[in-house]
A protein has these predicted regions:
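Short, well-ordered amphipathic alpha-helical segments that serve as non-catalytic structural scaffolds
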Residues: 52, 85-100, 200, 249-265, ...
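A short glycine/serine-rich beta->alpha loop
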Residues: 75-81, 112, 139-142, 188-190, ...
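Secondary-structure boundary elements
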Residues: 98-104, 160-168, 205-212
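Acidic-glycine-rich active-site phosphate/pyrophosphate-binding loop
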Residues: 119-133, 172-182, 226-231, 285-299
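Conserved beta-strand elements of the Class I
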Residues: 9-11, 108-111, 168-170, 273, ...
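Claisen-condensing/thiolase-fold acyl-transfer catalytic domains that form or cleave C-C bonds
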Residues: 3-4, 90, 116, 129, ...
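Conserved beta-ketoacyl condensing-enzyme motif
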Residues: 48-133, 144, 269-285
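Condensing-enzyme catalytic core mediating Claisen C-C bond formation in acyl metabolism
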Residues: 1-82, 168, 177, 181-252, ...
Length: 354
C-alpha cells in the first residue's frame, strides 16, 4: 500500500475573519478613551509604543461597534462568544465544504477547538443545528490548547477519520479573543490588547489522495513553564498572562517539535519550502526563525497575516496556510504548519502537496 493510500488528506479549508475591522490607530484611540482613567502615564506611553508598532496594521473583531466592549457584563460577553464562535466557524465550514465539492450530508465527524470561552454543551452541538449536520455525527469539543490548538485538533480529526473507516471529518478552530478583553496596568493585558483579534477556520479531511497529504505531526509540552503564557481566572473572567521571556522559551520548544516531525521522514529544514508559522508577535516569530534556521523569505505569509489580522490564536495558522496557497505550492513540495502557545507547548504538522 502506498503512502498516499495510508495517509489522510486535507481536501480543502477556509478561513472566516470577524466582521469589524479596526486599524491600530483606531484601537489605540479606543483604549485611551475607554481606560485612561485607570491607567498610569507609563501604561499610556506603553500603549502608544505597542499599538504603533509597524508589524501589525489592523485586526478583526466579533463586534458591531467598539461600544460593545466597554464595561461588557460577563453574561453579555458569554452570549457574544457563543453567537460569534458558532457563526464564524459555520461560515468557515460551509466555505471549506463547498471548495471540496461536498455538502453537510457528507460529513461524518466534527472536531472543534477554542480557548477563549466555555459553553456546555459545546460549539459542535450548535453547529449540528445551524448547519443541519447528521444527528448521529461523531463530535468532539477541545478546550485549553491555546494558540497552538489547531494542530491537536487536526490530530484528533485525523484519528477520527482513520478510526471511523473513512468518510469526511471537519476540523474547526475558532477564537473570540475580544471576549477576554481586560485592561489595567498589567503589561500582559496591554500587549494582548495590541496583538489579538477574532476569527475562525475549518479544514475538510478525507482519504482521497487529493489536496494536502497529512504526513506526520508532533507536539512538545513544557508544563513547568505554563505560567509564562496562559489564561488566569479573576472574578469569574479570563485574563491573559504573557511573560516577556516567551521568545526565548517558545523558540526552544518550536525547534524541538520541528526537529521531531522532520526527523520522522529524514528531512531537514532546507527541504521545507513552505512554512505556516503562527503569528505570535514579531519578537516570537524572529526568535523561532533564528532558532530553527528558517530563511526570512519563507516567512512572508506569516508576516502578512500578522500585519492584516494580528494573532487570532488557534485559527491563525490556517490564515497563514491560506496565504501560502495563494502564493503557490507546487505538487510534491513540503510544508510545515507550526503553532505554539499555552502549555507551554509547540505543535507541528508536516504536509505534502498532492
Amino acid at each position: 500500500m502506498s503512502i498516499q493510500e495510508k495517509n489522510a488528506h486535507i481536501a480543502s479549508f477556509a478561513v472566516a475573519p470577524a466582521p469589524y475591522i479596526a486599524d491600530q490607530a483606531t484601537a489605540e484611540e479606543f483604549m485611551r478613551k475607554s481606560y485612561s482613567n485607570r491607567l498610569t502615564s507609563r501604561s499610556l506611553s506603553l500603549i502608544h509604543t505597542v499599538f504603533s508598532h509597524p508589524s501589525i496594521k489592523k485586526r478583526h473583531f466579533a463586534i458591531d461597534s467598539t461600544d460593545t466592549l466597554v464595561n461588557e457584563e460577563p453574561d453579555a460577553r458569554m452570549a457574544r462568544f457563543t453567537q460569534w464562535s458558532v457563526e464564524l466557524s459555520a461560515r468557515a465550514i460551509q466555505k471549506a465544504l463547498a471548495r471540496a465539492g461536498l455538502s453537510v450530508g457528507d460529513v461524518t465527524g466534527l472536531v472543534v477547538n477554542t480557548c477563549t470561552g466555555y459553553i456546555c454543551p459545546g460549539i459542535s452541538t450548535y453547529l449540528i443545528e445551524k448547519l443541519g449536520l447528521s444527528r448521529s455525527i461523531r463530535t468532539y469539543d477541545l478546550v485549553g490548547s491555546g494558540c497552538g490548538g489547531a494542530i491537536p485538533n487536526l490530530q484528533v480529526a485525523e484519528a477520527l477519520l482513520k478510526g471511523g473507516g473513512g468518510g469526511v471529518v471537519v476540523s474547526a478552530s475558532v477564537e473570540i479573543c475580544s471576549a477576554t478583553l481586560q485592561m489595567d496596568n498589567d503589561i500582559s493585558l496591554i500587549l494582548s490588547n495590541a496583538l489579538f483579534g477574532d476569527g475562525a477556520a475549518a479544514a475538510v479531511l478525507w482519504e482521497k489522495p487529493e489536496g494536502l497529504e497529512m504526513v506526520a505531526s508532533a507536539g512538545r509540552y513544557v508544563p513547568e513553564q505554563r505560567d509564562t503564557i496562559r489564561y488566569i481566572h479573576k472574578n469569574g473572567q479570563l485574563y491573559n498572562q504573557l511573560s516577556l521571556k516567551l521568545p526565548q522559551l517558545v523558540n526552544k520548544a518550536a525547534a524541538a517539535v520541528v526537529a521531531d516531525v522532520l526527523k520522522s521522514h529524514s528531512l531537514v529544514v532546507k527541504d521545507i519550502k513552505h512554512w505556516a508559522v503562527h503569528t505570535g508577535g514579531e519578537k516570537i516569530i524572529n526568535a523561532v526563525r533564528d532558532e530553527i534556521g528558517i530563511p526570512e523569505e519563507r516567512l512572508s505569509a506569516t508576516r502578512k497575516v500578522l500585519s492584516e489580522y494580528g494573532n487570532m490564536s488557534s485559527p491563525t495558522v490556517w490564515f497563514v496556510l491560506d496565504e501560502l496557497l495563494q502564493q503557490g505550492i507546487a505538487p510534491n513540495e513540503w510544508c510545515v504548519m507550526l503553532a505554539f502557545g499555552a502549555g507551554l507547548s509547540a505543535h507541528a504538522f508536516l504536509f505534502r502537496k498532492i
